[in-house]
Swiss-Prot record:
Active site, UniProt feature: 41 (nucleophile)
GO molecular function annotations of the record: RNA binding; tRNA pseudouridine(55) synthase activity
Reactions it catalyzes: uridine(55) in tRNA = pseudouridine(55) in tRNA
One Pfam family named in its UniProt record: TruB-C_2
Record-linked InterPro entries: PsdUridine_synth_cat_dom_sf (IPR020103), PsdUridine_synth_N (IPR002501), tRNA_psdUridine_synth_TruB (IPR014780), tRNA_sdUridine_synth_fam1_C (IPR015240), TruB_C (IPR032819)
Organism: Synechococcus sp. (strain WH7803)
NCBIfam families in alphabetical order: TruB
Family matches, as SUPFAM superfamilies: Pseudouridine synthase
EC numbers: 5.4.99.25
Parts forming coiled coils: none
Name of this protein: tRNA pseudouridine synthase B
Gene name for this UniProt entry: truB
Keyword presence, Isomerase: yes
Entry annotated with the keyword Isomerase: yes
Superkingdom classification of source: Bacteria
Amino acid sequence: MTAPLGFAVIDKPAGLTSHACVARIRRLLGIRRVGHGGTLDPAVTGVLPIAVGQATRLLPYLPGDKTYRGVIQLGITTNTDDLEGEISSRQPLPALSSAELEQALAPFRGLIQQRPPQVSAVHVDGERAHARARRGEQMDLPERAITIHHLHLLNWCPEQGQLRVEVHCSAGTYIRSLARDLGQNLGCGGCLASLRRTQALGFQDAQAIPLPERPEPGATATDPPALPLLPPQDALAHLPQRRLSAREQEDWSCGRRITPGADQESDAVVVLSEGGRMLGLGVPDGTGGLQPKVVFEARG
């Protein structure tokens, strides 16, 4: 049986953790080497890229930006900064026009400092913040630099105090924190009502497929796999490519440097066979040559 290799783009359903989705894919394919590209909270739906087999080694090279569509609820604060948590306060809804709300959103665009939610995956003294928060601990989490490239107001419903937004942001951005901080700036409090991720690591909503059903007890993995996988190079369209001759491919599989070709101005280069099969990633050595960094089908 050929080892599966590639990316599955899952439309994560509400109610499941990202880890639970990975565990189901492991069971379905019968392999352990499976990882996801960016945690989604259980209540959040949408694009969850899952790397299968040696494609897990490519995750650090994928673009980290993500895009979300969500609803922010003004007038309510919770201990988790979303409506999944316990309500901490209720305040009268602000009388805002769409133009005034746009002004309130302006400070959150660009490079900003953001404090993660108390219930988050941030490490505090070697432990996840959410574990300490659920024990009732209050933590002074430091602010972190993040970038919100685009923040669009899609709809504003003043009667309900809900605004629908689209956010294109850097890795490490918390939309729950955005909702909390917007409400704080407006003086009424706020939290996240719902959220869907529409783009992650270069994968789009249109590519996402439903999470496969849980395999029956005793079921065995299939060949080919019962899960469609995108070729690994599809996730690396932002990187230059180099095709190797049969002789160069032999050197590559043994971990040897590839002799100079065209100059590559990039931190990494996708290496392909003559037929277009991905062989791994190389690092330019400054002379036009490539040093192997990630080698699929390595020998010796």
